[in-house]
């Protein structure tokens, strides 16, 4: 599995009153996402254990290697 070497803000999302968010079409297409695909939300926490960020990962890609892939990405985004 290749790891992402660059991270950037892809979109600003808004949650509706039902708690739903919409991923822009261009982002869905680039990520190869389609209706019915399952995503895992991984929460990043600050020093007070407050959730400060969420990462969405395709469910079929989640395994024991995810921590080693996600950790460097978080460092680039949050410090």
UniProtKB/Swiss-Prot annotation:
Keywords: DNA-binding. SUPFAM superfamilies: AbrB/MazE/MraZ-like. Pfam families: MazE_antitoxin. Residues 10-60 form the SpoVT-AbrB domain. The keyword DNA-binding applies. GO terms for molecular function: DNA binding. This is Uncharacterized protein AF_0476. It comes from Archaeoglobus fulgidus (strain ATCC 49558 / DSM 4304 / JCM 9628 / NBRC 100126 / VC-16).
